[in-house]
Each structure stands twice: as structure tokens, then as C-alpha cells.
Amino acid sequence: MKRLSARSTAALLALALLLIGCQASGDLIGRTINISGEATLSDPQAKRELRDLAAGRERILLNFWGSWCVPCREEIPLLAAYVASAAPQATVVGVLYKDAAGPGALAAAELGATWSTLIDGDGAIAAQIPVNAAPLTLLLNTSGEVLDYQVGPFASLEEIDAFVSGK
């Protein structure tokens, strides 16, 4: 078996870092995401607005996920623990990304995703970013302005708390 040279390994690592950095293209901070008249997994006939989904909190964790996405499935129980924590500072709202409502609803129930999950069937929400990979989590205020974002799954409750609090 042939081994990669140090130069080849460095080139592959640089390419991987470049691709990871391009997962959410463009400068997202300060961008406003419009969520209006959207259906949810729990109520496909609903026409939900971002402010309604905030549930009285000033910050929203908008999490793009799919039932097909292994890192998403690993992250959902952690987000569920955050939601169940004593005083979460943000409301979690899911966006079903490149997925159908049926598999999404099954995965949400199986993994404990009890929060509202928007059905982005036409990709209109994801196109505003644009989302190129999942999971992607945006920290929004109630006006839909992106305060911060994370590409890839959170690793701990402490990481989620630090992300929401801006530390």
C-alpha cells in the first residue's frame, strides 16, 4: 500500500479546511433571515412566524438538520438536553433540510426533538443562507438577524451555552 507524502497530506488537509470553511457561504453575521407563513412538522397546516416561534425569548437557535444526516442525529439529543435545562437562554427551532416531512417527523420523535421544526420543502429558508451542509445552527434575534453561526454539531451543553451567550 502506498503512503501519502507529507506534501500530499498537507494539501489534503488544506483542502478539507477550505471546504469546511465554505460550508455556510458568505458572511452570515448581520444577515436577516425571513421566516413567515411556514408549516411545522407538528402542524403542517400552520403558518408560523419567527416571533411566534421565539416563545418569548430574545434569542433563537435555528438548527438546519435532516433525518439522513448522521451528525444531526447525534446532535439532536444534546439540543434536547439544552431545551430541558433549567433556564435555556434561547428557543430551539429546527429547519428540516433536504428532507421530507415523514422521515423528519419520525426522526424528531425517535431522537427527542420536541421543539418546532419548520418544513422547508421548497428550500426557501435554506436558500437565504445558503446552507451547504448540515447541521448548521444560526443564533438569531427575534427580528431574524444572524448574531452568530456554527457549522457542524455542538459537542456539549457548555458549548451551546457559550454560543448563545456570545462567550
What name fits each language-model region?
Residues L61-L62, V92, T137:
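Hydrophobic beta-strand anchors of alpha/beta hydrolase catalytic cores
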Residues M1-S42, P153, L157-K167:
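N-terminal targeting signals for export/organelle localization
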Residues E58, Q89, T114-W115:
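A generic structural signal for alpha->beta connector loops
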Residues R51-R73, L79:
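Short active-site neighborhood of thiol/selenol oxidoreductases, capturing the structured segment around
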Residues R31, I35-S36, S67, N132, ...:
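Structural detector for helix-capping/boundary residues
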Residues A107-A113, G121-S165:
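Thiol/disulfide oxidoreductase modules built on the thioredoxin-like
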Residues R73-L111, G121-A127:
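Structural microenvironment flanking redox-active thiols in thiol-disulfide oxidoreductases
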Residues N34-I60:
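A short beta-strand-turn-helix
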